[in-house]
Amino acid sequence: MIALLRWGIARPSAPLRWSRCFATSTEKGDEGWQTVIGLEIHAQIKTGKKLFSKASTSYGHVPNTNVDVHDAAFPGTLPVLDINAIRLSIMTALALNCQINPRSTFDRKHYFYHDIPASYQITQHYNPLAWNGHLEIREGDNGSKRTFNIGIKQLQVEQDTAKSQTVGDAVLVDLNRAGTGLMEIVTDPDMRSPEEAGAFVKKLQGLLRRVGSADGDMEKGNLRVDVNVSVHRPGMPFGTRCEIKNINSVRFLQAAIESERQRHIAHYCTSPLEPLAQETRGFNELTLQTYSLRSKEEATDYRYMPDHNLPAIIIDDGYLDSLWKNLPEMPWQSVERLVKTYGVTKRDAETLLGLDEYSAQGIAYFEEVVEQDKKIAKKATNWIAHELLGQLGKAIRPWTPTIVPAPLMHELVTAVESREITGTTGKAIVKHFVSLPESASLPPSFAELLAELGLTPSAASVEDLTETCKKAMNNQPKAVADFKKGNEKVVMRLVGEVMKLSGGKADAMKAKDILLDLLKD
């Protein structure tokens, strides 16, 4: 269970320590430099309402319509904590292998700006919800060249700010986002390349969606990334750290890191005696370069203090155990299991995973199609990931598990594999399903479906198939001549002609055998 108690003595946390190093003026290029990267990620919690009020968090509404009196900081209003936001945050922390703080508290971070109506933000400075976790990055993830763990320093729950926009001399403020619950996830500076940072963000997005705690949509601002970058010579202390704020895509994250990395190296190579200024920087998406926002040489005094209006959060072991048992299979675990159990490729497994990142319907659909018959697993993957999704792509239609019901897809795959129907017939069936409206009723059995479409397997005799093969040879004299000259691959062109003449009903393998016999006579 989660219990809420009045706040007590707060425990300050120790800040990360970063130091500087310098290069000599004779050093050229970026070889021999090591980049150090740490991330601060803000993910909006997917509860449908704000952290301390009942206002909606729906995206795209008219400005200043999703606002409660507490979000606008009306005097006398009190925060009411959404316990579901805490539950989802704890599940995220468990998935990140974090230690859960048995007693966490809320604090006020004071500053004056347009986007903070109360002039303070409710956060967790002294006693965060969780800490000391990690997320493993595998070699090959987003181009990562090593397998390693990225440490999670802490996960804390806090309020999001409003949006503000400067128009001429005026500043327009939209309070729709103000008060939305955020998980702030702070990593240790364990990443050494833009690709590793991108791999972490991508993996975290999948984790958040599978847990159900956040959408992780960077384009909508549901997930925002601040990145800290420094460079140094191997074996030397870390260089001066600069922070790049509010990056909204993985591609831009990697470009921002590379731009900042090159800027630091250029400074140390050209001005080795001049300290690099510690700054907060922005990122220009057009030039793919960072630019200075403000100096960070002096730490801002936010005058943190415990929030008297909010009780402490007390979490017992029994509640944690129940959440741990209900954690879903993580995306990378699903991919590994499919590869190991069914022998499918990692790429195809990731394609199935991508059909539904939230509840893994694509993987459940695949396993229902296979019905524990590992012999057809690879073929089933081909039919789903390539044929079905290919047809859906042409029709500009999203995948759902009802377009081709799993039992019918299972019968289709097994029928093709047992040569009851041809691959051409199977493709025609898939195309038929894709063309049907969602409300269309389906035949009760696979046999009736074939009959309805006029695709019932032909019971033609060997003699009939031989006659069809002879017609195909007459229609393709050049292919016959090429075969006689030693080009045996052209037999497949003749098989295609047989399938065309038979309306796709002929057995392609039998047709090939007969054609080879006829061609060698």
Curated annotation (Swiss-Prot):
| Record flagged with keyword Oxidoreductase | no
Gene Ontology BP annotations: glutaminyl-tRNAGln biosynthesis via transamidation; mitochondrial translation
What is the protein name given in its UniProt record?
Answer: Glutamyl-tRNA(Gln) amidotransferase subunit B, mitochondrial
Q: Name one GO molecular function term.
A: glutaminyl-tRNA synthase (glutamine-hydrolyzing) activity
Family as reported in the entry's similarity comment: Belongs to the GatB/GatE family. GatB subfamily.
Q: Which reactions appear under catalytic activity for this entry?
A: L-glutamyl-tRNA(Gln) + L-glutamine + ATP + H2O = L-glutaminyl-tRNA(Gln) + L-glutamate + ADP + phosphate + H(+)
Q: Give the record's subunit note.
A: Subunit of the heterotrimeric GatCAB amidotransferase (AdT) complex, composed of A, B and C subunits.
- Species of provenance: Cryptococcus neoformans var. neoformans serotype D (strain JEC21 / ATCC MYA-565) (Filobasidiella neoformans)
HAMAP family xref list: GatB (MF_00121)
Gene3D superfamilies in alphabetical order: 1.10.10.410
Name the Pfam families for this protein. Answer: GatB_N, GatB_Yqey
